[in-house]
Swiss-Prot record:
PANTHER family: ATP-DEPENDENT CLP PROTEASE PROTEOLYTIC SUBUNIT (PTHR10381:SF70)
Intracellular or extracellular location(s): Cytoplasm
UniProt keyword list: Cytoplasm, Hydrolase, Protease, Serine protease
Protein's name in the database: ATP-dependent Clp protease proteolytic subunit
Active site per UniProt: S101, H126
Gene3D superfamilies in alphabetical order: 2-enoyl-CoA Hydratase, Chain A, domain 1 (3.90.226.10)
E.C. no: 3.4.21.92
Organism whose genome encodes this protein: Francisella tularensis subsp. tularensis (strain SCHU S4 / Schu 4)
């Protein structure tokens, strides 16, 4: 989830003295999960582990999932998406900066009524990308698989946005960028927020 080794440390004073946390561990104490950067196996596994941990800590308390991501691997992202749907706590999603490709699907997959974006953020939907080399028979297998994946992703977006499948298919044919207010009108998010008080607890 972190693209370089510079991770801020937070010093917290307790009755027993001072404790140092990296910033992401400190946010986790507040039930905040942060996806920063590309969706890949490593970042997805970290997010999944945090979601499962927070469910075990309190299955009735919301989780806040902040997303600033250009997207990435479909299989890794769908693992996060399925976990969001599987666990008991509502997962509130908040876009800060960019939620593109798989990032936009994770944003839309948050609990209904609890999907947010800051006003200057951008959201982008499109069809999955594929580039395969090898024998013709293998290319054919991969082509069929990516069409199945495309159909699955379109159905997920249709479910969460309320758009009909035909509209989703047309709108994801090419990169489709939206500002926060456009994403709200489309059904990818529920609220455009300018202050923390606007987030539903």
């Amino acid at each position: 989830m972190i693209t370089n080794n510079l991770v801020p440390t937070v010093i917290e004073k307790t009755a027993g003295g001072e404790r140092a946390f990296d910033i992401y561990s400190r946010l986790l104490k507040e039930r905040i999960v942060f996806l920063n950067g590309e969706v890949n196996d490593h970042s997805a596994n970290l997010v999944i582990a945090q979601l499962l941990f927070l469910e075990s800590e309190d299955p009735d308390k919301d989780i806040y999932f902040y997303i600033n991501s250009p997207g990435g691997m479909v299989t890794a992202g769908m693992g996060v998406y399925d976990t969001m749907q599987f666990i008991k706590p509502d997962v509130s999603t908040i876009c800060i900066g960019l939620a593109a490709s798989m990032g936009s699907l994770l944003l839309a997959g948050g609990a209904k009524g609890k999907r947010y974006s800051l006003p200057s953020s951008q959201i982008m939907i499109h069809q999955p990308l594929g580039g395969f080399r090898g024998q013709a028979s293998d290319i054919e297998i991969h082509a069929k698989n990516i069409l199945r994946i495309k159909d699955r992703l379109n159905k997920v977006l249709a479910h969460h946005t309320g758009q009909d499948l035909e509209t989703i298919v047309k709108d994801t044919d090419r990169d489709n960028f939206m500002m926060a207010d456009e994403a709200k009108a489309y059904g990818l998010i529920d609220h455009v927020i300018e202050s923390r008080e606007a987030i539903i607890k």
